Amino acid sequence: MVIKAQSPAGFAEEYIIESIWNNRFPPGTILPAERELSELIGVTRTTLREVLQRLARDGWLTIQHGKPTKVNNFWETSGLNILETLARLDHESVPQLIDNLLSVRTNISTIFIRTALRQHPDKAQEVLATAHEVADHADAFADLDYNIFRGLAFASGNPIYGLILNGMKGLYTRIGRHYFANPEARSLALGFYHKLSSLCEQGAHDQVYETVRRYGHDSGEIWHRMQKNLPGDLAIQGR
């Protein structure tokens, strides 16, 4: 186990998470007692207590007052906030994780983009207009793309879609910085934003579904060609 945390709390958090991932502390089992665990990791009990509370909030653990702390099946109890952690834990599964993330984005965005363009066209156009001034480099496009999808999610009038995009932000923007280094990807994205703006202006809401699905397919093809050179820094860095 190689841990690159920058603080005692970060080290303890990574130690426990990696131990859960590697089945040293399997789901459904009980964590060692606080004193034993703090000595094992090499941190104070106060620090350990803070870490356990944070991991419980993220769904890794269940703290039971007066009872031992239970290890959860994190797939069933955690949220989108652990995406970057999963990418760091299992590099071999990163391509599949990213495919799943992008598939979810496409599936839900067919709903909220159509709703935004139909019910709140002025807000939708305001979001899409931000593409007019984007600088032609990867970082700028990564931020733009995330903010356009997020902006349209909130423009739909259902803030839950926006919260889902919030949960994807970390890994989503890291992927974007790699993906948008490709000029073809930047060109495709600009065409997509322009098409959505035109559909909004025309009131052609029935074409949104196919437009979003087509963009998901075409951008997915570019992404798959680029996966051979996937950088190792997509995962979150140690705390």
UniProtKB/Swiss-Prot annotation:
Gene3D superfamilies: GntR ligand-binding domain-like (1.20.120.530), Winged helix-like DNA-binding domain superfamily/Winged helix DNA-binding domain (1.10.10.10)
Localization (cell): Cytoplasm
One GO CC term on file: cytoplasm
Residues in the DNA-binding region annotation: 34-53
Residues of the HTH gntR-type domain: 6-74
Matches recorded under CDD domains: WHTH_GntR (cd07377)
Single GO term (MF): fatty-acyl-CoA binding
Disulphide bridges, residue numbers: none
GO biological process, one term: regulation of fatty acid metabolic process
Keyword terms: Activator, Cytoplasm, DNA-binding, Fatty acid metabolism, Lipid metabolism, Repressor, Transcription, Transcription regulation
InterPro entries for the chain: FA-response_TF_FadR (IPR014178), FadR_C (IPR028374), TF_FadR/GntR_C (IPR008920), Tscrpt_reg_HTH_GntR (IPR000524), WH-like_DNA-bd_sf (IPR036388), WH_DNA-bd_sf (IPR036390)
A Pfam entry, by short name: FadR_C
Source domain of life: Bacteria
Role this protein plays: Multifunctional regulator of fatty acid metabolism. Represses transcription of at least eight genes required for fatty acid transport and beta-oxidation including fadA, fadB, fadD, fadL and fadE. Activates transcription of at least three genes required for unsaturated fatty acid biosynthesis: fabA, fabB and iclR, the gene encoding the transcriptional regulator of the aceBAK operon encoding the glyoxylate shunt enzymes. Binding of FadR is specifically inhibited by long chain fatty acyl-CoA compounds.
Oligomeric form and interacting partners: Homodimer.
PANTHER family: FATTY ACID METABOLISM REGULATOR PROTEIN (PTHR43537:SF52), TRANSCRIPTIONAL REGULATOR, GNTR FAMILY (PTHR43537)
Protein name: Fatty acid metabolism regulator protein
Originating organism: Salmonella typhimurium (strain LT2 / SGSC1412 / ATCC 700720)
Species lineage: Bacteria, Pseudomonadati, Pseudomonadota, Gammaproteobacteria, Enterobacterales
Chain's gene name: fadR
